[in-house]
């Protein structure tokens, strides 16, 4: 395979030579001589097309781009477009005075063996740099960094158009920044030519105005950009949080709340800030680099090409040495850790060392590790010096080369002294901008790659079925468990419910009792559609529970737990929580009276507008239960689930709840499931289910179960027995 690749590369080289050598006269004879620039571009584009097809064939044979082969495509582009680009800039710089002989001379010069070789030598580092920049945006995992960046910017919606305005202001600001180098060159020419003072003063004022305008445009650009990115931050936070809320209940069992919260808040904020900050710098320095490049070509296309050819050598070689220095620094740290380990082992086992009289042996061992580290330290220091020296010398050589070549152009009258001064200032800023861009690309890739954390939640499909569509206007509230089995997602092998079958009838109170761990609270969770049965069916009015619309179902089914959670809001907001309408104050007060919450709420100075604190921590357990019961009653549910919801209530409020369940006018249309360990509540229930190991062990009324003398009676007697 390697031999075929080298043979194909040699054939491409030969084709390139033949294209430039024997085919030139034929191509030139077919083109209009009055448009010399057209000839150059036709040859360049033809060369690019032919060589590009050849490269595609080579990459196809090798099943993709690997190693140096990946640089073939940018190499072909650099070779093919270099001369047309040079001819175009010469045309622009000469204001249309490029002659036919100039274009022909460029092409025939490039077909000479020495020039042909020089063009390849010059294009190779440029292609390597091109490939390096391209690899920074290579696909990471299953996503492409560019696609992820576009998706992040997609959160801007219509406001994404503001970025075009930002780019325009940015370019104008960068152009304004060019005033100082430009006028510095002009002032240099005036000083050398003894120009009058008014011209000098006028141009100083013009330079100042352009600089101030550039600063104002930069300020406006930054302001619009930051406001736009702030909109993106808020939108991303909202969408991520909404995506989390869509997940099934099992998702929150597998993932700790702290981890989810960190992902929604801190990780999302860090990713958004990192992307917006890095993108801002990237756009700014890219705009500067492009503006500087235009002014450099305008000043001297020849010196600009010299600068571009040397850029790869200026940055790639120090980068390579930097990797060597970094690897040596890692080895030094590893060597230091080993020497530290030797000392730690000796000191922690000092009695053993002394009992074997091996103090000198441990000292020699430690010294050996230090010698190894010393050798690595020397290599690291040399690599660091080489990196710094190479960076300094390569930059200095480029500056000296530009000054030398520019001086030759000044001597020949091709450019003025002022133009050379301006070009040097442009070139210094341009190399700095390119250096910053090269350092920003990895940062940008890392920032965009971190957005995978966000997309992991945004793209996650909930395991629970989608919301159904049933929303009948008349519902009875008949609940049927038919051979229901269930295991929690985080413990799929542990069956909590097994073959559970029972019916809850409208207008009745059914008490569900049993020992801890028998599955009582799981029944309540299934009735709220927080989980779906792993076996059997759960029906509401003859229809599977998952077929009901999500919002409709939870207006008909309400639950109160033993330790209900309230939100850090007012009593009024907590009672009205989740309603799709705004209840009147009379409705809120009425349900608060029913639940026994009205009396203590009225005792607060701000009444129903009093904040209850985070998770209701300013209230007692009984007060939280009373507010939660009011929150359930205001929905006027057909199915009310009380999961030990009165355990913390005082005697008066418990009596109030009993009246609510058994004497309220609404009880005839309400199905109640009462999960409790309180005998006073269970005894009055119309029907009692005794749950044992996930299935119904006994059922009947209180008197029937007591006469039967089974597990229910044993539990009642155990609870009634005095404590020893």
From Swiss-Prot:
Cellular component terms per the entry's GO annotation: centriolar satellite; mitochondrion; phagocytic vesicle membrane; TAP complex
Positions in coiled-coil regions: none
Catalytic activity: a peptide antigen(in) + ATP + H2O = a peptide antigen(out) + ADP + phosphate + H(+)
Lumenal side: 33-36, 90-109, 184-203, 296-304, 416-419
Chain ranges of the ABC transmembrane type-1 domain: 163-446
Sites marked Inter-subunit salt bridge with TAPBP: 16
Enzyme Commission number(s): 7.4.2.14
UniProt GO MF annotations: ABC-type peptide antigen transporter activity; ADP binding; ATP binding; ATP hydrolysis activity; metal ion binding; MHC class I protein binding; MHC class Ib protein binding; peptide antigen binding
Family per similarity comment: Belongs to the ABC transporter superfamily. ABCB family. MHC peptide exporter (TC 3.A.1.209) subfamily.
Name this protein carries in UniProt: Antigen peptide transporter 1
Species annotation: Mus musculus (Mouse)
Gene: Tap1
